[in-house]
Structures are given as C-alpha cells and as structure tokens.
Swiss-Prot record:
UniProt-recorded name of the protein: Hemorrhagic metalloproteinase-disintegrin-like kaouthiagin
Active site: 150
Binding-site residues for Ca(2+) 1, renumbered to this chain: 17, 101, 203, 206
Organism: Naja kaouthia (Monocled cobra)
GO BP: any one term: proteolysis
Lineage: Eukaryota, Metazoa, Chordata, Craniata, Vertebrata
Cofactor, free-text remark: Binds 1 zinc ion per subunit.
SMART domains named among the record's database cross-references: ACR, DISIN
Length: 401
C-alpha cells in the first residue's frame, strides 16, 4: 500500500511540455506545405491527449519546428542511431533555446526493419526524454497511436503481455498493432505508477502557461489556452461547477453551484472569477431549523427527539419533561455535567441539557439509552424557546455562540 504522500503524487495532474520536430523528408513528402503539416501534428497531439487522459496526463505542445531547409543532424534509417543523434541535438541545441519536458522527432525516413518508432524507456525529465516516430501512414490515427506508444515507453511502460487486456482493444502498448489503439491496459497503468513512484519525475508537475501552447485553442481539451477562462473537458465530462464547458468561460456571478443540502447548510454561488465552486459553508449557529424544532449547530440541527431516534430507532421519541426532572437528583444516572469527577445535578431550568431520556411511542416509560456513563443532550440542542444547551446549561441562543 502507498503512503498518503505517494497517493497525492500519483493523483496529481501531470503536464508534459512537448516539443515536436518535423524533419526535412516529411516536409518534402507533404509537398512543402507547412500549414498542412501543422494541422496534421495538431490533430495527432489532440488524439494523443485523449489517450493519456485516463492516466491524468496532459500533453501541451509548446513548440513545433519544421526543418524546411535541411535537417539539423543526420537522420538515418537505423532507428537507434537517429534516436541517439536526436538526444544529443536536444541536449546541446534545443534545451538551451527552449525548455521542454520531452521532444519527438517526426520523420519521413523509412526506419530499418519493422520499427516505426523508438524511445528511451523510463526517461522523462532526463537528458534521454526523447523519442522518434516514422510518419509511416497517411492515417493520422495510426501514427498518433505510435506516438502514444513511444511516449508510453518514456513513461516507464513496457510492452503488453498476452494476459494484459483493455476494452475496447487493441491496447496501446501491444508490440505489433495494425489498427489504431485507444486504451492503456491495466498492466500499462501498473507499469506507469511503478515508474512514477520509483523515479519521481518532477518536471511534469508544473502546469504550462496558456501563452506557451502553440497549438490552436480547443475548448474541451482540459487546457486553458489563449481566449479561454477555464477548460473542464466536454460538457458530459466537466467536473467544474462554475465553468461553462461549451464556451470555456466562467459561469456568471450568482449562479448556484451547490444547493443547500438541508436547513443548516447554505447554497454556494459562483463568483464569476473562478471555475470552482466556493468551499461548502454552513448556516450560522443558532439559526432556526426543522420548522423551529431546533437551532443549527455546526451544520446539524440537534433535537432531543432526533437523538432518541438515532440511538434507539424510529419507534422512540423524547420523554415528557417529568422524566428530565430526575436530572435534578445528581445521582449515578441523572445529572447535568461533571466537575472534577463529581456529577452535578441540574438546576430546574437546565434539566433538558443533562441526561437524555427517551420514551417508546404510546408508552409512559422514562428510558435511558444504554451507556454506562449515560448519554447527554448534544451541545446546541433546543431546550426552550430561544434557548439551547451549552456545557450542561440551558442558555440564551443569542449569547451561546
């Protein structure tokens, strides 16, 4: 089992500031059409983001470089050689110029063998946080699946065994895929969590600024981008009560975002300045509740009747006042409060703030709920008009709180 601190780290949203290089061969393959290449890359990033969302990872495209004149290092068909060259180029040239968490080379070269991608395993936030993908198919979704697969390796995820399943398939980390993959398997999620706790990559905890993101703003992708105030995903998925998922704008001030749950709770309203609903707040202590049967106390409406029902069941109610008068005796069972180990009897006005007495409906008994020390009236319980129990005394509700 994990420590609370480990669980906090696992649950935290992760952000990969992602840099993509399109090499010269891919540029030529798309007939020197930079706008078309950009759209293709933006669509891929969007697809990759969708696949990583269940892992609480957001991919933020903070740089897209198209090598329209020539490659900045020699891109070779040997995948491992190109990966090493790309790693060295990122380290010496790209990082000093533009900080990033991970970089990808998207190449038009035909990599040797059956490989269409290669990555350093478990390498995020290190000098080896790079991968190479061949743009091997016109179908964007297939290449986006390969991007997700190789970035998965960077995140410590191994290839799936035969026993690993995901619905719908095929799984993203299968070694060989012929169709676009949509989901990580349970094995992949386990690998990823083990990698996170082992290596603790820190660079993925900071959220990129909206001005750093170079891809066009898409309302519904969980990123607050230029022109958006909030982004909580699709209208069906949105969990932010004060963000309008359809427009990615804050809901107006005064819109109710959390209804009052009961008499002693207050409704919360959006501020117009935040996507989140304000903290749950309670009705003030002493506010009348349950048709004036009680007064609010710390978000509850304590009454003697409810206390009897909670302890003994729905067939019980509070005893008549005659039973409570026994609290003036100050003996073993009937008293108002303890002082230095001594049971203090109740004054006549305080009897309903001492030992609790309940009666089975349609009987006249004075029952004491079973407890060796007796059950006392709860603090804040109404003991008369405008009066509540406080420290074993029946006091004015105006001065009690």
């Amino acid at each position: 089992t994990n420590t609370p601190e480990q669980d906090r780290y696992l649950q935290a949203e992760k952000y990969i500031e992602f840099y993509v290089i399109v090499d010269n061969r891919m540029y030529r393959y798309y007939n020197y059409d930079k706008p078309a290449i950009k759209i293709r890359v933006y669509e891929m990033i969007n697809a990759v983001n969708t696949k990583f969302r269940p892992l609480k990872i957001h991919i933020a495209l903070i740089g897209l470089e198209i090598w329209s004149n020539e490659d900045k290092f020699e891109v070779k068909p040997a995948a491992s050689v190109t990966l090493k060259s790309f790693r060295e180029w990122r380290q010496t040239v790209l990082l000093p110029r533009k900080r990033n968490d991970n970089a990808q080379l998207l190449t038009g070269i035909n990599l040797n063998g059956t490989a269409v991608g290669i990555a350093y395993p478990g390498s995020l936030c290190t000098q080896r946080s790079v991968f190479v993908v061949q743009d091997y198919n016109r179908r964007m979704s297939l290449v986006a699946s390969t991007m997700t697969h190789e970035l998965g390796h960077n995140l410590g995820i191994h290839h799936d065994e035969a026993s690993c399943i995901c619905i719908p398939g095929p799984c993203i980390m299968l070694k060989k895929r012929t169709a676009p993959a949509f989901q990580f398997s349970s094995c992949s999620i386990r690998d990823y969590q083990e990698y996170l706790l082992r290596d603790r990559p820190q660079c993925i905890l900071n959220k990129p600024l909206s001005t750093d993101i170079v891809s066009p703003a898409i309302c519904g992708n969980y990123f607050v981008e230029e022109g958006e105030e909030c982004d909580c995903g699709s209208p069906a998925a949105c969990q932010s009560a004060c963000c309008d998922a359809a427009t990615c704008k804050f809901n107006g001030a005064g819109a109710e975002c959390r209804a009052a749950k009961h008499d002693c709770d207050l409704p919360e309203l959006c501020t117009g300045q935040s996507a989140e609903c304000p903290t749950d707040s309670l009705q003030r202590n002493g506010h009348p509740c349950q048709n004036n049967q009680g007064y609010c106390y710390n978000g509850k409406c304590p009454t003697l009747t409810n206390q009897c029902i909670a302890l003994l069941g729905p067939h019980f109610t509070v005893s008549p006042k005659g039973c409570f008068d026994l609290n003036m005796r100050g003996d073993d069972g009937s008293f108002c409060r303890m002082e230095d180990g001594t049971k203090i009897p109740c004054a006549a006005k305080d009897v309903k703030c001492g030992r609790l007495y309940c009666t089975e409906k349609n009987t006249m008994s004075c029952l004491i709920p079973p407890n060796p020390d007796g059950i006392m009236a709860e603090p804040g319980t109404k003991c008369g008009d405008g009066m509540v129990c406080s420290k074993g005394q029946c006091v004015d509700v105006q001065t009690a709180y």
